[in-house]
Amino acid sequence: MSRTVLVSGGSGYIAGFLIRQLVAEGWTVRTTVRSLAKEAPVRDLLAVDNSRLRFFAADLNADAGWAEAMAGCSHVAHVASPLPASVPKDANELIVPARDGALRALRAAKAAGVKRVVMTSSVAAISYGRGRGVHHFTEADWTDASQPGISAYIQSKTIAERAARAWVAAEGGAMEFCSICPSVVLGPVWSRDYSASLVIVKKLLDGSMSACPDIGFGIVDVRDVADLHVLALNAPGMAGERFIASGRFMKLREIADVLRAHLGAEANKVTTRDVPDWLVRISALFNPLAKAVVGELGNVRNQDASHALAVLGWKTRPEEQSIVDCARSLLALGLVRP
């Protein structure tokens, strides 16, 4: 029996890999884009069986299009969410579309008789607002978005997932809901319109990051994130589940060293210098990017993905492979010139 799934945000990084895998596994896939002008270029990039993929125009900020996109679907992967390339002036520019878009998708899914929704959240909803130091996080943890210094992006992911879970508990009926919380998503780039999560690798490669501050993050491969979504769509008993999707925590210095070790002359611009904490703190007085970084200095956030490994049998690639594959694809696409 053919299974039909809606993947929201079809032009996005995670969604593209997810669509490819779902089509390969025999699903009939529908996907949303903000404008159908994106359909032709996205189809060309995906290079899948076009008879198994349909596009619909739907925006996180409006009701139009969602009912049509959901009609006949048994499953939904709600992947679409705003991810800015720069810090917004008003946090609500991210919070409102993330929260309201998730609720809009859930309401449309219930009205269409969808059996299960898998929502792409983030470790941003899990591992912030706990103070400085070395921390270990599981799916039981939640970010305290009320703490000072929490960025608009972190607030948006936390508020959106909490709102989605509250709505499902109150209004979802028999519809199942689970969430997947990736860390920083790296891996091969499939488009010149690349995800904001890849900017760090790009800046290291092109030399625009002239020194590494003492910060880091968990890393996960985009292909493994897509795998985890497929597992969550297929597995029984997913109602209420939450899965961290992350590998090990790596400092920027470690990432830079991986690039230099594997790319030879193509990594000649990758910095070998570290920036001292005191200089980051001074820069934060007048530089908004430094201000966003200063609260992360010295922090280690270990996000434990053992639940996904144990419950769903999820398997992950080495972090080094994700970093190198990301870098090589940026170079191959001409997005970075060595």
What kind of region is each of these model predictions?
Residues H78, P82, V87-Y153:
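Conserved Rossmann-fold NAD(P)-dependent oxidoreductase catalytic core, especially the SDR/UDP-sugar
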Residues Q147-F177:
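Active-site Tyr-X1-5-Lys
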Residues L36-P41, L46-D100:
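NAD(P)H-binding glycine-rich loop region in Rossmannoid oxidoreductase-like domains
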Residues R3-W27:
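N-terminal Rossmann NAD(P)H-binding glycine-rich loop of SDR-like oxidoreductase domains
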Residues G172-M175, G187-V199, A232-F243:
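Glycine/proline-rich active-site loop of Rossmann-fold NAD(P)-dependent oxidoreductases
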Residues L228-A292, A310, E319-P338:
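Mid/C-terminal beta-alpha module of Rossmann-like enzyme folds, strongest
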Residues V87-P88, D144-I150, S191-R192, L198-V220, ...:
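A conserved pocket-lining segment of Rossmann-fold NAD(P)-dependent short-chain dehydrogenase/reductase
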